[in-house]
């Protein structure tokens, strides 16, 4: 009924009580936790939030608990709603990929272990950064500023992104 209309809204985060009859599930009760209403009136926030939802839809398997990734998604939606939507999205993707086993090594040179201070190269097959002295064949040079932001995002939890200054 209309008392549950919020449950069908885009980005609704709620606790649902379902009943099942003849292999069909029906929402009997729903308690809204957050509607993330702030993402709806801004196209950039809306698209960033849509990427989070699509990531969850594509990469979190039904019936397989992914508490860390789900919690990161909720925090990212809050960050997208209240903070910088693109930083919140990028931080979510980096953290969620890491949680699902596809993390990137961004804190030091993968080959020599030294801190990267100037030119930086990213190798996509190994998902790692390399310094100029150790760059493997096929690695792509990226801007140091890009590397710095990605490295900072990887070191922060998604919950802390909306309060961060990565400039």
Regions from the language model: what does each represent?
Residues 1-167:
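Non-catalytic alpha-helical scaffolds and adjoining flexible linkers that form interface surfaces
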